[in-house]
Structure formats: C-alpha cells, structure tokens
UniProtKB/Swiss-Prot annotation:
Catalytic activity: XMP + L-glutamine + ATP + H2O = GMP + L-glutamate + AMP + diphosphate + 2 H(+)
HAMAP family reported in the protein's UniProt record: GMP_synthase (MF_00344)
Name this protein carries in UniProt: GMP synthase [glutamine-hydrolyzing]
Domain of life: Bacteria
Enzyme Commission identifier(s): 6.3.5.2
Species the sequence originates in: Clostridium beijerinckii (strain ATCC 51743 / NCIMB 8052) (Clostridium acetobutylicum)
Any Pfam family: tRNA_Me_trans
UniProt xrefs under Gene3D superfamilies: 3.30.300.10, 3.40.50.880, HUPs (3.40.50.620)
Annotated keywords: ATP-binding, Glutamine amidotransferase, GMP biosynthesis, Ligase, Nucleotide-binding, Purine biosynthesis
Length: 510
C-alpha cells in the first residue's frame, strides 16, 4: 500500500523515536533516517515532509552531524527541532551562538498566533527547553514567530519555502501546545491526511512475512508478554503451523506466569508451543554476577543458545521471531545517540547466531503494539498485560541473583499487581512492579530487631515508554500493599515507593 511519508532525520537526540511517535499520532507514517542519508536517497523516498531532530552537538563542533544544504531546495516542508532548528539557521546564514543563559526544563514561550505553525493555539504556554546554544539571529528571509525571556528566536519560519524551526521540544508532553503544533505542520503545512492505521499495518506485515518466509520454518521467542504475543500472532497468521513457538522458562518469570502462558497460547491460539524448563541453567550462568549489563548479555546469549538447541530438535529452522519494538532500539543507542542500557532484544544478541531475524514490531511503539493486538483478535487480558523485560526478574533483583531473592520479589510483585487490579487501576497505570534494590535495613517485628530486605515499588504513567511520570497511586492503596508485603513475604521489613520520572531515571531500575 502506498503511503504518504514523513522523514525524521536523526541527529542523536534521545527524543527521536518520540518525534516519530507524535507524527504517527497525526495519522501519518514516518521513518527515521540517519543524518548522512544522501539527497538521492531522500528523493527516492519521496517524502512529503522532513523533520530534523534534536541532538547533543553544537553546530560549531568538530565532526558535528549535518545535512546537505540541497535538502532545503527540494520543495518539501522542513521542521527543525532544537539542534535541528539551530542547524537550519546555521546552514542558511543565520547566527548561532552560546546562550548567555542556558534553558533547561519548562519555559514560558510567547508565540505568533498568525503563523500557520501555531494556528489554533489560542494562548502562549509552557514548552520544554534543553539547549546550551541558541539562535541569535534568524537567517535572511525568516521571520521570528516565538520568543522567551532569554531566547530571541524560540521559533522561526520562511513561509514561502515552508521551512520552520523551533528551539523547544514540541514532541514531549511537557510542551502544552506541542502536539497541536505538530498537527499543524503535518496537516496544514505538509498537506497530509490520515493514512496510517494499525489495521492496515497488520495486514501489510502479514503479507510481507508470508512472502518473505514462504514454506520455510520459523522459531518464535515467546515470553507471553505483549510484544512477543503480538509478534507471534502476526507470524502465525502469515504462516500458520510453520511457526514453532519456544517458551523459555528461565526461572526469572513472575508468579504463575509459566503455567498461564502455556495454557492460554495452546488453548486459545492453537499454536505450536514448546515449553523449555531451563531455570537451573540460567541461574547457574548468573551466579555471582552483579553488573546489570553483564546480566543482560548473559541472558541474551543463553536465550539464543537455547533456541539453537531447540531448533535442532524441531528440524530445519530459518528464521527467529523477536518482539523488538521502537523504544528497544533507541535505548540501545544509534549511530548518534549514547547508549543508555543494552536491550535484551538488541545488544544481547551473539554475533554468531545462526538465524535470520524477523522483528515485525520494530517500527511500533507500545500503544501501537497493543492496537495491533486488538486488531488481530488477541484477548484483551493479554493485550493489556504488564510490560515485562526479556531478562525478567533478573533486572528487578539488583546485585547478585539468588533463588531466595527471586522468590521475595516474585511474591511482592504479585501482591502489588493484585491490589492495583483490585483498585481498577491496572489499565490506567502504564507499568507497575516490585523490585529488590539490594538494600537491607533495621526494623522491629514482634518486639524483635530485624535486619531484612527492602522492596521498592515502581509505577509510572506514559503513552510510549519514552518519557513517563511516576503514578499518583492513592495512599490507602500503597498502605495496603505495604502492609501485605511486610506481613506475607518473609525477609522484608521495609517498602519504598519510587517517585522519579523518566528522564532522568529509566522505568526499570537496571
């Protein structure tokens, strides 16, 4: 199916995938390309709009990322954000300098409401700033359309050439008018209509996989989580019983999860499911390991080795399915962005693995994955399962992993999830879980001194996992969860609640 396309040019900002997410919320498909993509390649893609992302560099830095100036002569609307805004100004003859006062965080912005970019935005508002340099003087032919107290060019436009730049991050939720501004760029300036939907995505992906695989055999890394479940269903609809799902029970799952996954997928989906119990193998490899990156690498390595062994038992296997999604990719780092932490679906893959990968969801954000799942008829209870990392409880037990610690966090997590569901908060909170932060503290229980583990509770609200706020769970629910865990889980005498947003923290502790 032919779609209108917006290209997002990656200059290394951590919000790059979020920009793509916001464009898709406008009902338009977009792709992210590296900054050194040639003009010829850009022309071949025939984009209807181009967005330059932010990035950590200065336009005056050595080997700073840039683009060919010809991109501004294609007749395609361009929107620069933060560094992308500064780069546009620099390349077109404006003046970029070190700001006398840096702007970080929420900032009051005055906008020119006569600009097409700010059409329908009735009042000035708060925008999210994060910059050291700023545009001191806009290029010739550009008009200043927004300012702050310390930033003389918070936004600029060349309406005739349809070139626009904003110093603030329109893509983050903190910018009050950000989504409306992006809608104006996509619909009013680029002239695009809604053409991107999860129903059409699912149909196209099923067709694509059917053509790619043909009669070959496929092995699916099934965990029972939302991502792997939807990935498995797409491939199952494409090739039927030529898909074999391997469910690795590595001993790092949540309470009763292994039995639930096996029962649901065999009964409701009629898939070829093989459950492999290798808890001792994984725990043996992880014994004495405390570093979180090492844990992830070990788990990624063992996952692939288990699949290789099981594939030999199944017969000829040509492809491996993984539930990799967009945030997995951005958090594992790109050519221009710093690695935050290696994701198990990306950084943990051995270089000598013997399969070709099929990653049907790598273009999607979590809410899009859920929407595809609904389109495919996956039961609501599975589509809305809590996100669960591939390394499982290994990264929710900080420090060295033992069976005792796993049992503690498993039971505490089950209580937390049960009470959140009882309070009907399970679909309004993006993600919630318990973790064991490797902290012991003094307490008093039954008139006796204790020196026991601390459990940390984490709950966040988000729409895409790129940014999140800590969830404001009612105190009475937190109180109930705390009392239950302390009374019902042996070895715990203290409960803490994590009230850190992302950024600066990540959602998981490791």
């Amino acid at each position: 199916m032919k779609r209108d396309l917006v290209l997002v040019v990656d200059f290394g900002g951590q919000y790059n995938q979020l920009i793509a997410r916001r464009v898709r919320e406008c009902g338009v498909y977009c792709e992210i390309i590296p900054y050194d993509y040639t003009i010829e390649k850009i022309k071949a893609k025939n984009p209807k709009g181009i967005i330059f992302t932010g990035g950590p560099n200065s336009v005056y830095g050595e080997d700073t990322p840039t683009v060919e100036k010809e991109v501004f002569e294609l007749g395609v609307p361009v929107l620069g954000i933060c560094y992308g805004d500064q780069l546009m100004a620099h390349l077109l003859g404006g003046k970029v300098a070190t700001a006398p006062v840096r702007e970080y965080g929420k900032t009051n912005v005055k906008v020119d409401k006569s600009s097409k970019l700010f059409e329908g935005i009735e009042t000035d508002g708060i925008a999210w700033m994060s910059h050291t340099d700023y545009i001191e003087e806009a290029p010739k032919g550009f008009k200043v359309i927004a300012t702050t107290e310390v930033c003389p060019v918070a936004a600029m436009e060349n309406e005739e050439k349809r070139l626009y730049g904003v110093q603030f991050h329109a893509e983050v939720e903190h910018t009050q008018f950000g989504q409306k501004m992006l809608e104006n760029f996509i619909h009013n300036i680029c002239g695009l209509e809604n053409s991107w939907s999860m129903g059409s995505f699912a149909e196209e992906k099923i067709k694509e996989i059917k053509e790619l695989v043909g009669d070959k055999k496929v092995l699916c890394a099934l965990s029972g989580g939302v991502d792997s479940s939807v990935a498995a269903m797409i491939v199952h609809k494409a090739i039927g019983h030529n898909l074999t799902c391997i469910f690795v029970d590595h001993g790092l799952l949540r309470k009763d999860e292994g039995d639930t996954v096996e029962r649901v997928f065999k009964k409701e989906f009629d898939m070829n499911i093989k459950r492999v119990n290798v808890a001792d193998r994984f725990l043996g490899k992880l014994a004495g390991v405390s570093d979180p990156e090492t844990k992830r690498k070990i788990i990624g390595e063992e996952f692939i080795r288990v699949f290789e062994e099981e594939a030999k038992k199944v017969g000829q296997i040509d492809y491996l399915v993984q539930g990799t999604i967009y945030p997995d990719i951005v958090e594992s780092g790109t050519k221009t962005s710093a690695t935050i932490k290696s994701h198990h679906n990306v950084g943990g893959l051995p270089e000598d693995m013997q399969f070709e990968l099929i990653e049907p969801l790598r273009e999607l954000f979590k809410d899009e994955v859920r929407a595809v799942g609904e389109e495919l008829g996956i039961p609501h209870k599975l589509v809305w399962r809590q996100p669960f990392p591939g390394p499982g409880l290994a990264i929710r037990v900080l420090g060295e992993i033992t069976e005792e610690k796993l049992e503690i966090v498993r039971e505490a997590d089950a209580i937390f999830r049960e009470e959140i569901a009882n309070a009907n908060l399970d679909e309004s909170i993006w993600q919630y879980f318990a973790c064991l932060p490797n902290i012991r503290s003094v307490g008093v229980m039954g008139d006796e001194r204790t020196y026991s583990h601390t459990i940390a509770l984490r709950a966040v609200t988000s729409s895409d996992a790129m940014t999140s706020e800590w969830a404001r769970i009612p105190y009475e629910i937190l109180d109930l969860v705390s009392r239950r865990i302390v009374n019902e889980v042996k070895g715990v005498n203290r409960i803490v609640y994590d009230i850190t947003s992302k950024p600066p923290a990540t959602i998981e502790w490791e």
